[in-house]
Regions:
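Internal, conserved structured core segments that host functional sites
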Residues: 91-154, 162
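N-terminal, charged/glycine-rich beta-strand/loop interface patches
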Residues: 1-113, 118
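Broad gene-expression machinery/nucleic-acid interaction feature
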Residues: 8-12, 45-47, 62-64, 94-96, ...
């Protein structure tokens, strides 16, 4: 794929609280990232859905997602569909997620699964920032191919970096890396034949 076809999608969103109600403060989106707001009942917290309109990412593509809940705001965010990472051509597919929960705020990040296809080269960085009395709930699921279609990905590279900051101080760092996919998937001390993990 020519470099002119590669994408660098961006989505930035922040929320603030006024009179004990949460409001959208800032919104920026750059193709193929879109942010949608489903209808909600008056007593429900604000919900936003992130959409990747390209249907997936390939080698050299990059997505940056930044979410911030300001003091006392409450928000739930999710992905509209599974993220798909296809076979790569030398360059990795990169996703950067930055989530910030300020003092007294509540942020839920509930993505659907990321599906890694055969020979994918995937890098993801999750940076989580929580301030005093802030609350943050985060989920993550990786699928090695589509089990229902009889797929099991045994070739490719995964690198996931997790950073957790409390009051701007790094308290947790995890660097997860797999390059010998077939060995890790089959080994009893690895995934032991499982094609999904969270």
């Amino acid at each position: 794929i020519g470099s002119n076809l590669l994408t660098h999608g961006k989505g930035y969103i922040s929320f603030e609280s006024k009179d004990e109600k949460t409001y959208l403060k800032d919104l920026y989106q750059e193709n193929p990232v879109k942010i949608l707001f489903p209808k909600k009942l008056s007593n429900e917290i604000i919900t936003a859905a992130f959409v990747t309109t390209s249907g997936g990412i390939v080698g050299g593509d990059k997505l940056d997602i930044i979410v911030k809940t300001c003091k006392k705001s409450e928000v739930q965010l999710y992905q509209q569909a599974a993220e798909k990472v296809y076979k790569n051509h030398k360059k990795p597919s990169i996703i950067n997620i930055s989530l910030t929960s300020e003092e007294g705020s509540w942020l839920e990040w509930l993505p659907q699964e990321t599906i890694l296809f055969e020979n994918s080269n995937y890098i993801k960085k999750n940076s989580l920032h929580v301030n005093t009395n802030g609350r943050l709930m985060v989920g993550e699921m990786l699928f090695l191919g589509r089990h229902a279609m009889g797929e099991i990905n045994t070739k490719g590279t995964i690198r996931e970096i997790w950073e957790i900051f409390f009051d701007e101080r790094l308290i947790w760092l995890d660097n997860f890396y797999i390059d010998d996919m077939d060995y890790i998937v089959k080994h009893p001390a690895g995934l032991n034949g499982a094609n999904a993990f969270a």
